[in-house]
Swiss-Prot record:
Pfam families: PAPS_reduct (PF01507). It comes from Shigella boydii serotype 18 (strain CDC 3083-94 / BS512). Its EC number is 1.8.4.8. The lineage of its organism: Bacteria, Pseudomonadati, Pseudomonadota, Gammaproteobacteria, Enterobacterales. The active site is at residue 239. Pathway: Sulfur metabolism; hydrogen sulfide biosynthesis; sulfite from sulfate: step 3/3. Signal peptide: none annotated. This is Phosphoadenosine 5'-phosphosulfate reductase. GO terms for cellular component: cytoplasm. InterPro entries: PAPS/APS_Rdtase, PAPS_reduct_dom, PAPS_reductase_CysH, Rossmann-like_a/b/a_fold.
Length: 244
């Protein structure tokens, strides 16, 4: 696999970019997660960043990437509505893994947004998308720009939802390379990695949560529900960060 030219790829239409990366992705599918990270660091341009929501299985990608690239900036987009357990989990993992945490937030406070727009998350898909644009997408775009990111690592997995089922290891999103080292991992592999390295699930895992985001759009799993149905009232799976 040869080095890739980000500027040249960004000039191509989306379909042509996918085709241009197809051969590389076929080779990346053969590598393990550590091999994918190492390949990206050797062949893709810096600066490098890792995003995390500090969700249920966040410790895996945080540990995996950080042990290969210590001090990599870890981007958290904080809506101000995370669970108290999530904020404690952030502190715990930041200390344990010595993370170089970079927290980004919306330019307007949560209180300002509610006063102006009401509770956007109660306003159907359109309201949820506007909420996500303000609190997730814009802060992430700002983070990528301020950190001069050209390669972005994330912990998405195909098993998590239908919208992620066909994602490749390597893509281009928001004008930068996006690498998904554990895209093909199943829940058993996640568990084994956590056990091997003395890591924990998010605290709410033990209370029946399969996925954790904001307090107002996250539901505890109940029999018959898919993981997707525990987020955004089942109307959406993605918060906007991993779309487009």
């Amino acid at each position: 696999m040869s080095k890739l030219d980000l500027n040249a790829l960004n000039e191509l239409p989306k379909v042509d970019r996918i085709l241009a990366l197809a051969e590389t992705n076929a080779e990346l599918e053969k590598l393990d997660a550590e091999g994918r990270v190492a390949w990206a660091l050797d062949n893709l341009p810096g600066e490098y960043v890792l995003s995390s929501s500090f969700g249920i299985q966040a410790a895996v990608s945080l540990h995996l990437v950080n042990q290969i690239r210590p001090d990599i900036p870890v981007i958290l987009t904080d809506t101000g509505y995370l669970f108290p357990e999530t904020y404690r989990f952030i502190d715990e993992l930041t200390d344990k893994l010595k993370l170089n945490l970079k927290v980004y937030r919306a330019t307007e406070s949560a209180a300002w947004q509610e006063a102006r727009y009401g509770k956007l998350w109660e306003q159907g898909v359109e309201g949820i998308e506007k909420y996500n644009d303000i609190n997730k997408v814009e802060p992430m775009n700002r983070a990528l720009k301020e950190l001069n990111a050209q390669t972005w690592f994330a912990g998405l997995r195909r098993e998590q939802s239908g919208s992620r089922a066909n994602l490749p290891v390597l893509a281009i999103q928001r004008g930068v390379f996006k690498v998904l080292p554990i895209i093909d991992w199943d829940n058993r592999t996640i568990y084994q990695y956590l056990q091997k390295h003395g890591l924990k699930y998010h605290p709410l895992w033990d209370e029946g949560y399969l996925s954790v985001g904001d307090t107002h759009t996250t539901r505890k799993w109940e029999p018959g529900m898919s993981e997707e149905e525990t987020r955004f009232f089942g109307l959406k799976r993605e918060c906007g960060l991993h779309e487009g």
